[in-house]
Amino acid sequence: MKTIDSIVTQAASIAAIRRDIHAHPELCFEENRTADIVAKQLTDWGIPIHRGLGKTGVVGIVKNGTGTRAIGLRADMDALPMQEFNTFAHTSQHAGKMHACGHDGHTAMLLAAAQHLAKHRHFDGTVYLIFQPAEEGGGGAREMIADGLFDKFPMEAVFGMHNWPGTTMGKFAVSAGPVMASSNEFKITIHGKGGHAALPHLGLDPVPVACQMVSAFQTIISRNKKPIDAGVISVTMVHTGEATNVIPDSCELQGTVRTFTVEVLDMIEVRMKEIAEHTAAAFGLTCDFEFERNYPPTINSAPEAEFCRKVMSGIVGSDNVLAQEPTMGAEDFAYMLMAKPGAYCFIANGDGSHREMGHGAGPCMLHNPSYDFNDELIPLGATYWVELAEAWFKQPAPVAAA
């Protein structure tokens, strides 16, 4: 495994920044303190910055030579609305807020890369360092784009990276095509007619109608889509009634839909609406159907994914670069990949043993109240960013950008 010496030398100071950010987590579009830290570090290293895209986003601009080519490297900054269980020194100081997905570590790895790139500009072009807010449900990537990210900072491609616990450190994973699913939510309100539970014939009970809908939705997955196409419909919330002897007036179903293609998503939305409305009508009831599309699928472009694989192989060896199996989780970096070529990869965060060395106890999985980013990963992640940036400008410009 290869890491850059100057990054290793500064790793402790970057880890201290990471732990400070971890101790002061900020939720979607509230990342003011974190953005201030990022902006100060970049400015101290002589990197010009632009603030305000996506409300709290920060973009650093590292330029060298006379080349007009450019790429973007992205890290997310926000935390999650959950209570941390850890008791180490850098545990969250804010009740109900926690860096449980490692965005503090993502920020730290990109800062470490920024520090090196500022001092050792071994490339001809511009590297845009994109520190993004509000990945956890806020669509910060979408907001940065809407505020002119790619208009103000034209780039040939954009790259993102996420830590992945449970895999031995020193490994990467990347693949072309869909790597994360779209995330969508639905809400169905079934309107009936309440009454006494002893006299069901005088009312219109929404509960059996809801049960029919829940079962029928699964036939969309098993009978309406191709078996080789992935799709998940999960009814995760059922709200109805307040008393055992009263037939309720209404019943509410909520849940999520996840797919890897827009085509499958389109079909699922249409069929869910048809099933909901027709099932309600068959029982003499009505319903309101709401469907909200959140994050689109994250789809890596093939040339950029292969480029990443080669860079990773040069750092950790080809045997340690895994094919990324698609996951039904969602990621708003998808918006950036809809606008630009690029790739989203994963870097192994270790098996969790780093947490038994004075860093608390418990599992180290994402969105777990005992999670903590592995600081030993900072030099490797930062080395990857630097190697990727330098290698990008050594290859010919993409045809579309030429």
Task: Please report, for each region that a protein language model flagged, where it lies by residue.
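A short acidic, glycine-rich active-site loop
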Residues: 95-104, 370-378
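Histidine/acidic-residue-rich, glycine-tolerant segments that coordinate divalent metal ions
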Residues: 58-59, 80-82, 86-98, 104-105, ...
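A structural signal for isolated positions on well-ordered beta-strands in alpha/beta enzyme cores
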Residues: 50, 128-130, 288
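Acidic/His- and Gly-rich active-site-bordering loop/insert found
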Residues: 1-99, 108-111, 115-123
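Metal-dependent amide/peptide-bond hydrolase catalytic core
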Residues: 211-402
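Divalent metal-coordination and catalytic microenvironments
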Residues: 21, 60, 73, 103, ...
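Non-cysteine beta-strand/loop elements that form the S-adenosyl-L-methionine
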Residues: 74, 83, 186, 345-349
